Amino acid sequence: MTTIDDYLQGIIKQILESYRHLLDLKDKPGDLEIIKTEILRINGFFKVIIKKIESSQIQSDIYIKLLKQTKHFLSNYEFEREIETMSTLYSDDPNRLKNIRLKIIESLQNNELMETIETIYNLKS
C-alpha cells in the first residue's frame, strides 16, 4: 500500500521533471505547445497536492509550507490565456517563447516554491 508520503513524492518527481523540461527548452518553433503542456501538468499536480495535503491533514512543517506555496502560485499566476494568445500570433518567435518560458520559471521560483519541492524530493530520495 502506498503511503501519502510516497504518493506525494511521486507527484513531486513529476513536477520536477516538467520544471526541468521547461529549463531545457531552446525556444524554437514548436516549443510553445511543450510549454503549454508542462504548465498545465504542473498546475494539475499542484491541485492534487493541495487536495491530498488538506484531506489527509498532514501536519509536517514542510508540507504545510508546500501547501501555502502551491495555493499562492495557483491564485497569483495564470499563463494559459497568454499562451493561447501567443499561439495564434507569435508561436515561432524565439524571443517571445523565451520570455514566456522564463516568466513561468521565475514564477515557480518565486516564494521559494521550487526550493521547497526540491527539498522534499531530496529528503525522501
Task: Identify the residue ranges that each predicted region occupies.
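Short terminal alpha-helical segments
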Residues: 1-45
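Extended amphipathic alpha-helical scaffold segments
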Residues: 15-23, 43-50, 74-87, 117-118
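Charged, low-complexity interaction regions
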Residues: 23-36, 53-61, 85-99
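Short, solvent-exposed, charged loop/turn and helix-capping segments
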Residues: 45-69
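Amphipathic alpha-helical binding modules
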Residues: 72-125
